[in-house]
């Protein structure tokens, strides 16, 4: 995938870039793997805003992705590489030998016509799914399970991967995209390779309207609000807020750690950078 630049026909267009979508091979998704997707506008069941700066955006349909890869020992041929509006990665339509079709995350290097399989005897090549026990040290993997059979939860965004750093007992040490080193059961499943669409991080939005297409609403600074709305609000004329930066609920921000200690902390060998 390459990055496409535009002629500066307007201020918003000047620095805008986008993906060239050259890797996309199908215009429409597989109908049997598409579901309706309702928007919440950031509201919960009581109608209250629980997620600020969310709403609007282009209509989407949800593509059902196979994160579990539980269809073992049956080879699947890649029929197409497709765009998915619900994630940064591309998705691949896998047609299994028994006739079933499923979407999987498209790893870097996967092409139409390639054959992938979920098996303990599978080759170590992009798109094949194995338990971590069967994958050599130093291999890049994505779509990694944290609980056996639950489905992949780690390293699913465009361009991400984790590296298998060590194995000891029933656990393996994985170096995650955040820099965190974490213990994961060796019987958990992972897919070989790096998630595709690696240039996604280099796309520049360019203008506010493009964020609105993505369902993102504007953010107002706390110092521009009234005291009733934010701890930084109010003051005569322009003010700096008068205190260390905090959230609208008074919790320190910009570096303040808010992660709560929990039972799974013992599986973290080294914290993220």
UniProtKB/Swiss-Prot annotation:
SUPFAM superfamilies: Nucleic acid-binding proteins (SSF50249), Translation proteins SH3-like domain (SSF50104). GO terms for cellular component: large ribosomal subunit. Part of the 50S ribosomal subunit. Forms a bridge to the 30S subunit in the 70S ribosome. Belongs to the universal ribosomal protein uL2 family. One of its GO terms (biological process) is cytoplasmic translation. One of the primary rRNA binding proteins. Required for association of the 30S and 50S subunits to form the 70S ribosome, for tRNA binding and peptide bond formation. It has been suggested to have peptidyltransferase activity; this is somewhat controversial. Makes several contacts with the 16S rRNA in the 70S ribosome. It holds the Pfam family Ribosomal_L2. This is Large ribosomal subunit protein uL2. PANTHER family: LARGE RIBOSOMAL SUBUNIT PROTEIN UL2M, RIBOSOMAL PROTEIN L2. GO terms for molecular function: rRNA binding; structural constituent of ribosome; transferase activity. Residues 213-261 are annotated as: Disordered. It comes from Syntrophotalea carbinolica (strain DSM 2380 / NBRC 103641 / GraBd1) (Pelobacter carbinolicus). Keywords: Ribonucleoprotein, Ribosomal protein, RNA-binding, rRNA-binding. InterPro entries: NA-bd_OB-fold, Rib_uL2_dom2, Ribosomal_uL2, Ribosomal_uL2_bac/org-type, Ribosomal_uL2_C, Ribosomal_uL2_CS, Ribosomal_uL2_dom3, Ribosomal_uL2_RNA-bd_dom.
